[in-house]
């Protein structure tokens, strides 16, 4: 099991659970109906009774449900990627590795460009390795230290 994506998904679920607000207002913002004073709103200055509609989108736990659905979709995508990797699909070459596209330069009839001036990394500034997994591991370590993540 690849722990970096699992840690990221656990962090997403923990953040959705901890940041879920029961006082979140559902639906579209702003006054609607008689509170706006439109044609159907009755006379101006008349006492109005504000009827609060049932919460739909901002109900407690809805962001947790969305995060759980996202985690399930991510798990399904990860499982599909794992199955695809095991069934003959090739993995993309990482930084510093030579892939199949790099090897076609050396064969007779290759284009001869090589990984030098024509490479994407030569033309982009600061194209070093990404630091995403490090952040994920730090956050996963923090969750593990807090006892929220159990391997």
From Swiss-Prot:
The keyword Cell division does not apply. Glycans are attached at residue 111. GO terms for molecular function: nucleic acid binding. Residues 127-151 form a propeptide. It comes from the Eukaryota. It is a lipid-anchor; GPI-anchor. Mainly expressed in brain. In brain, it is expressed in hippocampus. Residues 1-24 form the signal peptide. N-glycosylated. The keyword Cell division does not apply. It is found in: Cell membrane. Keywords: Amyloid, Cell membrane, Glycoprotein, GPI-anchor, Lipoprotein, Membrane, Prion, Signal. Belongs to the SPRN family. Prion-like protein that has PrP(C)-like neuroprotective activity. May act as a modulator for the biological actions of normal and abnormal PrP. PANTHER family: SHADOW OF PRION PROTEIN. 'Shadoo' means 'shadow' in Japanese. This is Shadow of prion protein. The gene is SPRN.
């Amino acid at each position: 099991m690849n722990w970096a994506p699992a840690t990221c998904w656990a962090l997403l679920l923990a953040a959705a659970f901890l940041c879920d607000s029961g006082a979140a207002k559902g639906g579209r913002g702003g006054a609607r109906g008689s509170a706006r004073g439109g044609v159907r709103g009755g006379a101006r200055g008349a006492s109005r009774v504000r009827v609060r509609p049932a919460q739909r989108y901002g109900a407690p736990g809805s962001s947790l449900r969305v995060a759980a659905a996202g985690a399930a979709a991510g798990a399904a995508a990860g499982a599909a990627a794992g199955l695809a990797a095991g069934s003959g699909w090739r993995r993309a070459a990482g930084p510093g590795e030579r892939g199949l596209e790099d090897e076609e330069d050396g064969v007779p009839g290759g284009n001869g460009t090589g990984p030098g001036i024509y490479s994407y990394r030569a033309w982009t500034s600061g194209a070093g390795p990404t630091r995403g997994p490090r952040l994920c591991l730090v956050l996963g370590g923090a969750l593990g230290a807090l006892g929220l993540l159990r391997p």
